[in-house]
Design a protein with these regions (language model features):
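Hinge/cleft segment of the Venus flytrap/periplasmic-binding protein
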Residues: 43, 175-179, 183, 194-198, ...
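Extracytoplasmic "Venus flytrap"
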Residues: 46-65, 69, 73, 78-92, ...
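Sec-dependent N-terminal signal peptides of Gram-positive bacterial secreted proteins and lipoproteins
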Residues: 3-24
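Hydrophobic alpha-helical
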Residues: 96-100, 104-127, 191, 206, ...
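Short, solvent-exposed amphipathic alpha-helices that sit
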Residues: 58-75, 150-157, 182-202, 216, ...
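Bacterial lipoprotein signal-peptidase II cleavage site
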Residues: 18-37
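Flexible loop/hinge segments that line or gate small-molecule binding clefts
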Residues: 113-149, 171, 265-275, 279-280, ...
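Hydrophobic alpha-helical segments within soluble ligand-binding/sensing domains
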Residues: 47, 91, 143-170, 214-218, ...
Length: 336
């Protein structure tokens, strides 16, 4: 990906002038973060955020980060998302509407990166990719996790956990997300390399695609148990919802009693499941920071600052040793 430079000082000045004249109207979903910090409300930048969905816990933390950044930075942030991560047309319609609704900048978590690249072609206002990158010159930075590296780190930890659990034949199967999705592909590649580098065997040909949802993960796990009655050491999952569902589906099967179930996101329910011995571990994304940083970068772009190609929001491995600490942190983000 080539270096992206932000040259939006003139556009930012024009946006401010338009706002002062009351000509920067936009459709607002009612989920905006407002600030009383400085200036008149009409002079605020208005930033559109379109996530992959708002129906999963992970995305509520991304939204919370976006909203808080809007408050702290004195900008209006309008967060929305489709009903599910397979509602492709719904997200496309949201993005198309927002591109023509007077926003000053756009933050997008694409369900289909190629489609989004087409939608934003020629856009002169700042565009930030969040969680999943978009290969387009209009995108100024990608804010998110290095998914492949993070998944590899998690897979290596899972291999060690499998050895500690008594497995001698370290085999792993992936419950992946939406087939063709860039994030799912990166995590798959990371899981594969991590398992193999740690000395395990990754059964790539037996990958199950479960569209990133729990109910399909149950079906996938049932298929794995039918195909492998002897048990599998590691089940690498695209997200925590899938990992928890797969672990519950395997409960009661003695061949899978010591299977390591690896999730991805490190959200609240994952921490609770780990503490309850219902999930082994999770690769934790910093969803709140990801949302917050994406708004920070959008504002920086509007001020004419130069952005790096990739803004790493960080990651960690959640196990029983640190799950409670992380749970407390996540509850703090939501004011609980």
């Amino acid at each position: 990906m080539k270096k992206r430079f932000v040259i939006f000082a003139m556009a930012a000045a024009m946006a401010l002038n338009l706002a002062a004249c009351g000509g920067n109207g936009s459709g607002n979903s009612g989920d905006s973060a407002q600030s009383a910090a400085s200036g008149e409300a009409s002079s605020k930048y208005k930033i559109s955020v379109c996530l992959k969905t708002l129906s999963a816990e992970y995305w509520t933390f991304v939204k919370a980060g976006c909203d808080q950044a809007g408050i702290d930075l004195g900008v209006s942030v309008d967060v929305k998302g489709p009903t599910s991560e397979t509602a492709f047309d719904e997200q496309q319609n949201m993005i198309e509407t927002d591109l023509n609704s007077g926003y000053d900048a756009f933050i997008i978590s694409p369900l289909q990166a190629d489609t989004v690249a087409t939608l934003i072609a020629g856009e002169t206002k700042p565009v930030i990719a969040l969680d999943t990158d978009v290969d387009a010159p209009e995108v100024l930075t990608f804010v998110g996790t290095g998914n492949e590296a993070a998944a590899a780190m998690g897979a290596k930890a899972a291999v060690e956990a499998a050895k500690e659990a008594g497995w001698t034949d370290i085999t792993a199967i992936c419950l992946s997300g939406v087939q063709g999705d860039g994030t799912a592909t990166a995590r798959f590649n990371g899981y594969k390399s991590g398992v193999e580098e740690a000395g395990g065997t990754f059964l790539a040909d037996e990958t199950q695609y479960a569209d990133a949802v729990a109910d399909k993960a149950v079906n996938s796990m049932e298929a794995i148990m039918q195909n492998h009655p002897e048990g599998i050491a590691i089940i690498c999952c695209n997200n925590d919802d899938m990992a928890i569902a797969a672990a519950r589906a395997a409960k009661g099967n003695s061949a899978y009693e010591k299977t390591v179930f690896l999730g991805f996101n490190g959200d609240k329910q994952a921490c609770e499941a780990i503490l309850a011995d219902e999930l082994t571990m999770s690769v934790a994304q910093e969803a709140y920071s990801m949302g917050y940083m994406s708004v920070e970068k959008a504002v920086a772009a509007l001020k004419g600052e130069k952005l790096e190609d990739f803004t790493d929001s960080g990651c960690d491995i959640v196990t029983k040793e640190n799950a409670q600490e992380r749970l407390d942190t996540l509850n703090g983000y939501l004011g609980k």
